[in-house]
Amino acid sequence: MFRAQSFLPVLALVLRVAAHGYVDQVTIGGQVYTGYQPYQDPYESPVPQRIERAIPGNGPVEDLTLLDIQCNGSGGSGTKPAALIASAAAGDEIAFHWTTWPSSHVGPVITYMGKVPSNTDITSYSPTGSDVIWFKIDEAGYENGKWAATDIMSAQNSTWTVTIPKALAPGQYIVRHEIIALHQAETYPGAQFYPDCFQVQVTGPGTETPTSQALVSFPGGYTPTTPGITFNVYSGSITSYPIPGPPVWTSNEAFSGGSSSSAAASSTAVASSTADSSSSAAATQSSSAAPSSSAIGTSTASSAAASGTAIVDANTCMNSA
């Protein structure tokens, strides 16, 4: 005889999985990479190599004091470096495609980058909570009655696009992209953080490294009293939202060192060839649409040879999906 009680835990799990999200695909400099698949990759043999650091699932981080707030994770230990690294030039776009995102999970979309220290390889580097390396390159919150994480991103096919600052010096960087869901953020803890981290080798003629005023650590970049961490989205009189964290950095000259603004979405709509994630993935997996290996610059290739890092093109990642 079927027992309703035995079905309830399964139903609860299904609802939990359906109610959250993560980045399942990223387009960097026009090349498409499969993100880490938390419900598939750990069970593959061999485990697929990715440019994204592993995440435990699609659930949130809620404790701002844990290392998990940095790049996701569970139990406070954070996450481990990925095996691969993508290549991009300063000024290139990065488009993050999210799995289905619930309309109730309103909030900001924020992207940071963190430079890997000299003489350190990104595939073996895990920032500590005291490493002040993270600078914000993009943010969007609430404007004209629209939330970035729901209204705006939904109109962009669940995709958010940012630009690597043109002034940025070459090197290895961790790109930290997150949504902060505010549907339970009236008190702390309550806000839900969904960070995903990707490994990128930046090339180009840029010469600038953000000054200390632009940098934060994770944990540390947000606290329970940081504006925007507690926020009542049901007040009925919202006109603006204070986005947590430092101001956006595009260059040291442009960086003002002031407080973060609740700017309109600074992302751009993804081109139709990449906005439709399913068609992009299919095109990338086909041999006829495989990206050219010439997309990896000479300087990047020589850097990879020196460090032993596996610089990959999109075809490598997509074929391991």
Swiss-Prot record:
Residues 1-21 form the signal peptide. One of its GO terms (biological process) is cellulose catabolic process. It is a lipid-anchor; GPI-anchor. Its EC number is 1.14.99.56. Disulfide bonds join C71-C197. It catalyses: [(1->4)-beta-D-glucosyl]n+m + reduced acceptor + O2 = 4-dehydro-beta-D-glucosyl-[(1->4)-beta-D-glucosyl]n-1 + [(1->4)-beta-D-glucosyl]m + acceptor + H2O. It is an enzyme of class 1 (oxidoreductase). Residues 278-306 are annotated as: Disordered. A lipid is attached at S293 (GPI-anchor amidated serine). Keywords: Carbohydrate metabolism, Cell membrane, Cellulose degradation, Copper, Disulfide bond, Glycoprotein, GPI-anchor, Lipoprotein, Membrane, Metal-binding, Monooxygenase, Oxidoreductase, Polysaccharide degradation, Signal. Its cofactor is Cu(2+). It is found in: Cell membrane. O2 binds at H183, Q192. One of its GO terms (cellular component) is plasma membrane. PANTHER family: ENDOGLUCANASE IV (PTHR33353:SF6), PUTATIVE (AFU_ORTHOLOGUE AFUA_1G12560)-RELATED (PTHR33353). This is AA9 family lytic polysaccharide monooxygenase A. It comes from Gloeophyllum trabeum (strain ATCC 11539 / FP-39264 / Madison 617) (Brown rot fungus). The gene is LPMO9A.
